[in-house]
Design a protein with these regions (language model features):
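Non-cysteine beta-strand/loop elements that form the S-adenosyl-L-methionine
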Residues: 102-103, 148-151, 215
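Aromatic- and acidic-residue-enriched segments that line the glycan-binding/catalytic groove
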Residues: 26, 95, 110-129
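Beta-hairpin (beta-strand-turn-beta-strand) motif
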Residues: 79-80, 104-106
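C-terminal active-site subregion of NodB/CE4 polysaccharide deacetylases
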Residues: 1-76, 83, 154, 158-190, ...
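A short alpha/beta connector and helix-capping loop motif
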Residues: 87-105
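Alpha-helical scaffolding within the catalytic cores
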Residues: 59-60, 86-87, 124-142, 175, ...
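Acidic (Asp/Glu)-rich catalytic clusters
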Residues: 46, 90-96, 132-149, 206-207, ...
Length: 261
């Protein structure tokens, strides 16, 4: 039977009542979710015997047909925002869950040096917000999290290719790899495309540097996409989760995974 794996991608998890939750952009993702709503989603996973597995577990399944639990799910957190450490991690700890965090290394470097860091995002344009330090990222690793690459600067890789060619794209690979080696003593195994911006050439350039490349997309009315047995490791599919996703839609995601698997 074809198995379908939901990979849930989050950006910000904020405490209830936080000003940052007041985002209203009709037809667009917000990238934010309240802590209580996130906790409810994690409780749903626990209540329904969903087993949270790592990105590496899924890639082993895709490449080597390694076994996965029948009701596997993967949790991803993009960018390396500070709230991933201060808000998200305690919630996941309470359920015994771990996740993969895809970090922007220029931002982690700057924050670790006491400097401000700003990036351009699909949801907010240029924004300056707190990121994790490398010390905090190392605490995630110690807790069983995987850390993946998300470029050095959070650039759109297809645009980077058009503007700077292969050399520009590879710079967004080499700088994170150097930072990972220096700070974590290892190279990143997995990569997530910022804003899902990619093309065949970027895949070709990145495929020998990472075990997997993850996509990203958003639909106003969620159309769930799953990573399946036939999915390429260069096109790991996922679901964006934020406060535009109702709890009914969240439940439907898992119902579709089971029904159509």
């Amino acid at each position: 039977m074809n198995q379908r794996i939901p990979i849930l991608v989050y950006h910000h998890v904020y405490p209830d009542g936080a000003d940052e939750l007041n985002v209203n952009k009709p037809g667009e993702c917000t990238g934010v979710i309240a802590e209580s709503a996130f906790n409810r989603q994690m409780q749903y996973l626990a209540d329904n015997k969903m087993e949270v597995v790592s990105t590496s577990n899924v890639v082993d399944w895709l490449i080597d047909d390694a076994p996965l639990p029948e009701h596997a799910v993967v949790l991803h957190f993009d960018n390396g925002w500070l709230d991933t450490f201060t808000v998200t991690k305690p919630v996941l700890d309470s359920f015994g869950f771990t996740a993969t965090c895809f970090v922007i290394t220029d931002s982690a470097n700057a924050t670790s040096e006491g400097k401000r860091a700003a990036i351009r995002t699909k949801t907010e344009g240029i924004v300056e917000k707190p990121f994790m330090t490398w010390d905090q990222i190392r605490e995630l690793v110690a807790a069983g999290w995987e850390i993946g690459a998300h470029t050095a600067s959070h650039c759109r890789m297809a645009d980077k290719l058009e503007a700077e060619g292969d050399e520009g794209v590879l710079d967004e690979v080499d700088r994170p790899s150097a930072a990972f080696q220096e700070q974590l003593g290892r190279l990143p195994l997995h990569f997530a495309y910022p804003s899902g911006s990619r093309n065949t050439r970027t895949d070709e350039l990145l495929q020998d540097h990472y075990r997997s490349l993850r996509l990203w997309h958003f639909e106003e009315q969620p159309v769930w996409s799953f990573t399946e047995n036939t999915t390429s490791r260069l096109a790991i599919d996922c679901q964006n989760i934020d406060n535009t996703v109702t709890f009914a839609d969240f439940e439907r995601l898992f119902e579709e995974a089971v029904t159509n698997g």
